[in-house]
Amino acid sequence: MLQVEGLYLCRGSNEVLHDIHLQLPPGQVVGVLGPNGAGKSSLLSVLCGELAPDRGRVTLQGRPLADWAGQERARRLAVLPQVSSLGFSFRVEEVVGMGRMPHGTGQRRDAEIVEAALRAADAWHLVARSYLALSGGERQRVHLARVLAQLWPGEEGSTLLLDEPTSMLDPLHQHTTLEAVRRFADCGAAVLVILHDLNLAARYCDRILLLEQGRCHAFATPEAALTPAALKAVYGIDVLVQAHPERGHPLIITR
């Protein structure tokens, strides 16, 4: 389990994150929401070890994150950044295969996992294509497959961090992507996903961390976190929140 206690982060004189406490339990999807500049991507950068906090602790499986060696950490923690770019004409299967580099499972097993991850990301039909020939949305799905392959099959002890994985996707693939993430968590992985779409978060996340200017406004179930009062305070928007008529999760409608 990835755990954060009393996290503070500053950039110069600007406090970006203030006293954040967070747990990513196995089998759950935690959504991080908030307006631009709320500290969402900065939080992910601390959680993956890219940035060191000014105060507080980040632990993975009870050990300080900084104590994990590179390959050992990579076998348990995978990160999909907001922008993933490659400047070389790799085939899609090679890009996804990069996720298997921390493992020593052999070429045959790796090929099976690459196929499974591409199918999970609805990108198997792209397997022989050049990465550089893909659209932005196709590239995003290929990189999702790469991080899924890195942790496949997503058992307990695996942690997946995703920064806006649906930002370039059409409505169909927004749902297929988050369905794949949901299935990964159902296998035992802990997942944190940064999203901007409130309704996608309400549908697919078990808990919501709602950030406001680097502070935790709410950390609760979608029903408890995504209230009209909270969304007015954080986003400045007036909304109607009602239960989805078929699925029961909160449905947010802008007034």
Curated annotation (Swiss-Prot):
UniProt EC number: 7.6.2.-
GO terms for cellular component: plasma membrane
InterPro entries, alphabetized: AAA+_ATPase, ABC_transporter-like_ATP-bd, P-loop_NTPase
Keyword Iron-sulfur applies: no
Pfam families: ABC_tran (PF00005)
PROSITE patterns: ABC_TRANSPORTER_2 (PS50893), HMUV (PS51261)
Signal peptide start-end: none
Binding residues for ATP: G34, P35, N36, G37, A38, G39, K40, S41
UniProt-listed Gene3D superfamilies: P-loop containing nucleotide triphosphate hydrolases (3.40.50.300)
ABC transporter domain: residues covered: 2-238
Keyword vocabulary terms for this entry: ATP-binding, Cell inner membrane, Cell membrane, Membrane, Nucleotide-binding, Translocase, Transport
UniProt subunit comment: The complex is composed of two ATP-binding proteins (HmuV), two transmembrane proteins (HmuU) and a solute-binding protein (HmuT).
Function text: Part of the ABC transporter complex HmuTUV involved in hemin import. Responsible for energy coupling to the transport system.
Protein name: Hemin import ATP-binding protein HmuV
Source organism phylogeny: Bacteria, Pseudomonadati, Pseudomonadota, Gammaproteobacteria, Pseudomonadales
